[in-house]
Regions:
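OB-fold ssDNA-binding interfaces and closely related basic DNA-contact patches used
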Residues: 50, 60, 69
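Short, flexible beta-strand-to-coil junctions
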Residues: 66-72, 158, 196-202
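Post-Walker A helix-loop "phosphate-sensing" segment adjacent to the P-loop in P-loop NTPases
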Residues: 54-64
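Pre-Walker A (P-loop) beta-loop-beta motif of ABC nucleotide-binding domains
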Residues: 30-31
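Short glycine-rich substrate-engagement loop in P-loop NTPases that contacts/grips substrate
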Residues: 67-92
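N-terminal pre-Walker A segment at the start of P-loop NTPase domains
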Residues: 1-25
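Phosphate-binding and hydrolysis-coupling loops of NTP-dependent motor/remodeling domains
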Residues: 170-234
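Conserved P-loop NTPase motor cores
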Residues: 34-53, 83-172
């Protein structure tokens, strides 16, 4: 059901839209574009791989996976059905795509760069190419708003109040809501994500998990100094 907010401001929507319960297919639909944000160590990348594996399994293997610019140490720990292209143009169709540290690619200060133009095309054609693009970032401050506005879902994994202070003004009311909802929720926060349905302006928690191939080694592979081919962006 689409909420009727007319020309309401982001602040009004964030303060008045009701919560709902999300099932997997509603929280993480594909194809489309999801933006995943949250504080360091909250499990953003782990959730991205879990989403990827779930969709791969539900599709009977028809949907593959891809990780853009994966660190060298990470590549060898991934299943063979996950591609690791170093360029946006190398991302396969019919796939769930993880773009970690998305602000390095979709950067608001380099909106005219060839990399940003490739990203804009990737996002715009995600449905035609049957792709779910998962953009992972700590916050939206440095992201190009063109990519954010094309998202079907904005997802938070336990955002920090400090990071919300420096969010882009368009996203700040929604991030503040996410912080409040996590503060009110009891239990293990690592097992849930707070979802904003950007198409219908509805909100709610969804259950999350870990991919069968996820490990502490895979986790630390993303936290070390090796940033894969990230240097090609500069």
């Amino acid at each position: 059901m689409v909420a009727n907010f007319g020309s309401a401001s982001p602040k009004v929507v964030a303060q008045t839209a009701p919560d709902r319960k999300f099932k997997f297919k509603d929280a993480f639909p594909h194809p489309g574009v999801d933006l995943v944000m949250g504080q360091r160590g909250s499990g953003k990348t782990a959730m991205g791989f879990w989403m990827m594996e779930q969709i791969h399994s539900l599709s009977g293997g028809a949907m593959g996976g891809a990780v853009l610019k994966a660190p060298a140490g990470v590549k060898k720990m991934l299943p063979e059905w996950i591609a690791t292209p170093n360029r946006i143009k190398g991302i396969p169709t019919d796939s769930v795509v993880i773009i970690d540290e998305a602000q390095q690619v979709a950067n608001s200060r380099r909106s005219g760069s060839s990399e940003n133009l490739d990203m804009a095309q990737l996002v715009a054609l995600s449905r035609q190419r049957n792709q779910l693009i998962i953009l992972i970032s700590h916050h939206s401050r440095k992201l190009d708003m063109n990519e954010v506005m094309d998202c079907s879902r904005v997802i938070w994994k336990k955002p920090s109040a400090g990071q919300v202070m420096f969010e882009r003004k368009e996203m700040k009311p929604f991030a503040e809501r996410a912080v409040q909802k996590f503060a009110e929720r009891k239990g293990n926060h690592h097992k849930v994500a707070y979802v904003m349905d950007f198409e219908n302006l509805s909100f709610g928690f969804a259950q999350t998990g870990l991919a069968s191939f996820w490990s502490e080694s895979l986790s630390t592979g993303y936290s070390g100094p090796d940033l894969g081919a990230m240097g090609t962006l500069f």
